[in-house]
Design a protein with these regions (language model features):
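A preference for well-ordered globular domain cores
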Residues: 1-197
Length: 197
């Protein structure tokens, strides 16, 4: 990306090359990629970048920004200071000002995942409850394990002390060779039994 700089101020941002007119002179889009940094600087075109521009929306909201124009390097850097979302809910459910916190959102995701994992065998549980064939042992064990895991995940979310702790629950770590070291707590679901594959 590039910025038009005049008198130390950014007057335009160009996310992609485009034909532009500067001081009455038309320049083709090719100047952005074909010209040297010094040639672009001579007409006020600086390299432009943003730092922390796209925070993980699950945990952060975009805060304020600071733009630094470096005339000697012909660069413009806009740095965003992202703000952690509230971990706890704000307001009360049903109120206009209610907003679910990060923990509520993460626990809802766990519930949805657990429901999805159980959905394929729900018919077996319903059939057994209505007096039909019993749920196969491996499937019953799996269903219980999914519910237990879901409950332990929600407890882990509730026990997280800050945003970094919540993020850590959903972060798998890897060895240098790319193999999994530790599966993230919120991704460590029971193995699906053969009867459901």
């Amino acid at each position: 990306m590039w910025a038009m700089v005049k008198a130390g101020q950014v007057t335009a941002i160009y996310p992609r090359p485009k034909a532009i007119t500067i001081d009455g002179i038309q320049h083709p889009a090719a100047i952005f990629t074909a010209w040297t940094k010094d040639q672009k600087k001579a007409i006020g075109i600086y390299d432009y970048s943003e730092v922390n521009a796209n925070p993980n929306g699950r945990y952060y909201k975009q805060g304020t920004s600071e733009t630094v124009v470096d005339d000697s390097a012909a660069t413009v850097v806009k740095t965003w200071s992202n703000v952690a979302k509230d971990l706890a809910d704000t307001g009360s459910k049903g109120d206009d000002n209610y907003s679910p916190g990060v923990k509520t959102e993460e626990k809802l995701k766990v519930k949805v995942q657990a429901a999805g994992l159980l959905q394929g065998s729900d018919w077996m549980a319903i059939r057994a409850a209505e007096g039909g064939t019993a749920v196969p042992s491996a499937v019953a064990t799996y269903r219980a394990a999914v519910r237990t895991k879901s409950n332990s995940m929600e407890t882990a979310i509730d026990n997280a002390s800050d945003t970094a702790a919540v993020i850590a629950l959903d972060t798998t770590t890897y060895h240098a060779n790319g193999d999994i070291n530790v599966v993230a707590t919120l991704q460590d679901w029971p193995e699906v039994p053969d009867a459901l594959k």
